C-alpha cells in the first residue's frame, strides 16, 4: 500500500489539482488508479489513550506543505498537529512550523452534527469557533494552503472517521 500511495501522490493530475485548489477527494473519485488507494492511518497509544494520526500534503505560497493531524479516540477532537514546508517565506508562511500556530489546533473539532467541517483559518485574530484557528499574519496564502490541505485529506478519511469503534 505504501508504494501505491507514493505513486498516486506523484500523479501529475493530482499535483495539478492540489495546485489549482481542487478537492483531493474529487480527484481521487475521478481517477481509477487513485480510487483504490488506501490512505495510511497511524495509531498511537499516548498515556493509555488511542490517537489516530493522519498524514496530509498540500501547497503553500511557494511550494509543498505537509504535516500530520492527530485525533483523539473520538475521531473528532484534534489532539495535535505538525506541519512543515519546503520553501515558505521565513517569518511569514514558514511560521506554520512554529508552536504558536500549531498549538491552537489542539482541542478543535472536525465534525458538527455528524457533518465534516474540518478547520478554517481566520484572519485578524477572529478565530473563536470550535472549527477555527488564527491565520499567520502576513502568511495568509500559506495559512489557507494548510486549511485546504487539512480539509482535502479529512474528506479522504471521512468514511474512516465516521466509523464507530
Question: What are these model-derived regions, one by one?
Answer:
Residues 1-165:
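Flexible, solvent-exposed loop/hinge segments and secondary-structure transition points
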